[in-house]
Amino acid sequence: MAAMRPALTPAYRAVIGASDPIMRQWSRMEVTGLEALPATGPVLLAANHDSYWDPIAIGVAAAPTRQIHALAKSSLWKPVIGWVLDGMGQIPVERGRGDASAMDRAIEALREGKCIGIFPEATRSKGLELRARSGFGRLARAVPEATIVCATVTGTVDDARFPKRPYVRVDFFRPADAHVDPDEPPAALPTRLLAEIRARAPHVVPGRRPKPVAPA
């Protein structure tokens, strides 16, 4: 019997349902490579993070296939917003220290067959080259059966041509080297993934519009 596709939680469905028309009204949005994102089973999703719009764009792009349970900074958990984020299955992370509780929740979610989304850089790049953090690698070691998928988001940093809508593209793909080696440092895997991601979605200074990189 085929595995059942995980259902979207009511809060997630509502937020994505409201965000989709806003995203598509604000931008000319294109989604490619969605077939790389499995409809069932544990998934670790890595993506670039250049704009506050990125998690919204990725969530909207993936919604036909999966709900993404993202690790997000705990400071977002304010009254009302925190309740919504909890309903969406998002996981708060205390930045600046190893948050074992967040890692445990993410591992549990993966073992339940959910899709965990992580920005390897752990914060918005703001046009700077940041190193990959080790969290993604630790999750991949803990749940080696998880499928590793990458996503690139381009166009979200630029609204300088307003009222002309920016061209936003979300591209999902399977990385060339997703091998989980228990003998290498935990940051080695996310470093490789980030290199592949940034080859397709170079760092962008806010307000600048890069030329899109064609999918490999």
Show the residue positions of the predicted features.
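Structural motif corresponding to alpha-helix initiation and N-cap regions
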Residues: 31, 78, 100-103
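Residues at the C-termini of beta-strands that transition into short coil/loop
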Residues: 35, 74, 94, 152, ...
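Non-catalytic C-terminal accessory region of glycerolipid acyltransferases
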Residues: 2-7, 11, 100-216
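Helix-to-loop junction immediately C-terminal to a conserved catalytic motif
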Residues: 11-12, 17-49
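Short hydrophobic helices that act as membrane-entry/anchoring signals
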Residues: 5, 9-27, 78, 82, ...
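Catalytic core of membrane glycerolipid acyltransferases/transacylases, capturing the structured
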Residues: 39-97
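Conserved beta-strand scaffold positions in the cores of enzyme catalytic domains, especially
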Residues: 31, 70, 90-92, 148, ...
